[in-house]
Design a protein with these regions (language model features):
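A cross-taxonomic marker for long C-terminal extensions/tails that follow the last structured domain
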Residues: 10-27, 98-163
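Solvent-exposed, acidic/flexible segments
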Residues: 52-62, 80, 101-102, 143
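Acidic helix-start/capping segments at beta-turn-to-alpha-helix junctions
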Residues: 80-97
């Protein structure tokens, strides 16, 4: 019991977390020794669901989770071309895909798009917040809805990441 309370009282240490090897400035992760291994033959097709908007000037943590997934798996030996990711964005988070001076996510999104990560906006949320397709960061896709996007992704072999 004492041991458990000591563990609970400890603050997490993020010293082992670092970005890279794919995204040098974001997507920090830590190596894990002795865990279930990943193999160079593993393949991933994963959809991330993001509805929470970032604080002004900050990176969207949901978007960065997708970058973390790529960084940690490539660092563990999975080839980058074995990883297909889509970030389905709805709710206020669609505003993090509109370019602008105060958008702390824009540079990250643009770099992730260059690496083949898809960003898919819920058209229903975009309509609610007055965001048109031509107002989005170049390369971001607009679908009828987030529900539609997830259904279509699942039909092509994507799983949904619950984190």
């Amino acid at each position: 019991m004492l041991f458990a309370s000591q563990l609970a009282a400890q603050s997490p240490s993020l010293d082992a977390f670092a970005p890279g090897p794919v995204f040098a400035d974001f997507g920090p992760h830590a190596p894990v020794e002795g865990g279930q291994p990943v193999a160079p033959t593993d393949r991933f097709a994963i959809a991330f669901d993001v509805a929470q908007r970032a604080d002004e000037g900050a990176r969207n943590r949901g978007f960065e989770s997708a970058a973390r997934f790529i960084n940690m798996h490539v660092a563990a030996g999975v080839p980058e071309d074995h990883i297909r990711l889509a970030v389905v964005v709805h709710g206020k988070a669609v505003l993090d895909l509109v370019p602008g001076e105060n958008n702390g996510s824009q540079a990250m999104v643009e770099e992730m798009l260059e690496h083949g990560v898809r960003f898919i906006v819920c058209g229903q949320s975009a309509a609610a917040y007055g965001v048109s397709t031509d107002a989005l960061i170049d390369g971001v896709e607009m679908h009828l809805s987030a529900m539609t996007a997830h259904a279509k992704l699942q039909q092509t072999g994507f799983t949904v990441n619950p984190f």
